[in-house]
């Protein structure tokens, strides 16, 4: 679980650094030539971020496979010690099929909830910014300072509150499925979430970065006949708005989901093995 940490952190660090450099250059009033350079670095950062997330998702997938094997061994050991046959993972077992279906649903549920969470938090921040412009005298004329602490407070509280639902799913789903349907269904849940979650997380990481870079590609004038402000550029901006939470929130969130579910399943394996 920790073997790829150094590589992932090193590759992932490039993107935020280049992105922040662009924001600092814009807020500092530096010339467009500086912003052009930081945009190039930001585009590269999106690519390195996708690569880094690929390492992280691959590491999570291998971890889940190892934990699944440990879960299988623990359940069978407990059942044999109690004089029961080993757990059946045959696809003719209806509980396994139900577990597979439930496991394939959970990554979509968590991905959707995190996407909606980002939208709600962004809406609250935009509303607060509008309130400050309306209520702080001289802010529109740059004669007064805004209140950035309030913005950070909203973002932090939203991040914590909106992660309650995905966290409950990741922790509560394995013991519930195992208790109600037995260890075979829980094994199916893990297998379904692994296959769907790993591919979904990779798709989100790569697609989000591609949509973000597509907007930058158009803004640099590399798509003849479609300058900044055109219909194609507006569509690319929408793609960027979807791509950012895709690659930065939902993709990593799904990878974490399958890993947490596997750990929780291993912890409760001996408790639900006899059901």
UniProtKB/Swiss-Prot annotation:
The chain crosses the membrane at residues 51-71, 96-116, 163-182, 189-211, 254-274. Its cofactor is Mg(2+). This is Putative K(+)-stimulated pyrophosphate-energized sodium pump. GO terms for biological process: sodium ion transport. GO terms for molecular function: diphosphate hydrolysis-driven proton transmembrane transporter activity; inorganic diphosphate phosphatase activity. The record marks 49 as: Determinant of potassium dependence. Keywords: Cell inner membrane, Cell membrane, Ion transport, Magnesium, Membrane, Potassium, Sodium, Sodium transport, Translocase, Transmembrane, Transmembrane helix, Transport. The gene is hppA. Sodium pump that utilizes the energy of pyrophosphate hydrolysis as the driving force for Na(+) movement across the membrane. Its main location: membrane. Its EC number is 7.2.3.1. Pfam families: H_PPase (PF03030). Belongs to the H(+)-translocating pyrophosphatase (TC 3.A.10) family. K(+)-stimulated subfamily. It is found in: Cell inner membrane. Requires K(+) for maximal activity. Homodimer. It catalyses: Na(+)(in) + diphosphate + H2O = Na(+)(out) + 2 phosphate + H(+). GO terms for cellular component: plasma membrane. It is a multi-pass membrane protein. It comes from Myxococcus xanthus.
């Amino acid at each position: 679980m920790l073997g790829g940490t150094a590589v992932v952190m090193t590759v992932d660090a490039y993107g935020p650094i280049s992105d922040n450099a662009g924001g600092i250059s814009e807020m500092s009033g530096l010339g467009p030539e500086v912003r052009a350079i930081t945009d190039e670095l930001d585009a590269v950062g999106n690519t390195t971020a996708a690569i880094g997330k690929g390492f992280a998702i691959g590491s999570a997938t291998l971890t889940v496979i190892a934990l699944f094997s440990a879960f299988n061994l623990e359940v069978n050991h407990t059942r044999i010690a109690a004089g029961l046959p080993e757990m059946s993972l045959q696809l003719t077992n209806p509980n396994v099929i139900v577990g597979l279906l439930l496991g394939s649903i959970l990554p979509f549920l968590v991905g959707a909830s995190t996407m909606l969470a980002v939208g709600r938090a962004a809406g609250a921040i935009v509303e607060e910014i509008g309130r400050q412009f309306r209520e702080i005298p001289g802010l529109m004329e740059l004669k007064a300072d805004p209140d950035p602490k309030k913005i950070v407070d909203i973002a932090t509280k939203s991040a914590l509150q909106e992660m309650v639902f995905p966290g409950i799913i990741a922790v509560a789903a394995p013991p519930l499925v195992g208790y109600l349907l037995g260890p075979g269904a829980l094994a199916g849940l893990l297998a379904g979430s692994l296959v769907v979650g790993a591919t979904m997380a990779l798709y989100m990481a790569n697609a989000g970065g591609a949509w973000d870079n597509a907007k930058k590609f158009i803004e640099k004038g590399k798509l003849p006949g479609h300058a900044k402000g055109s219909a194609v550029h507006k569509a690319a901006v929408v793609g960027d708005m979807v791509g950012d939470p895709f690659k930065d929130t939902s993709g990593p969130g799904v990878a974490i989901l399958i890993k947490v579910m596997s750990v929780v399943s291993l912890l409760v394996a001996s408790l639900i093995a006899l059901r």
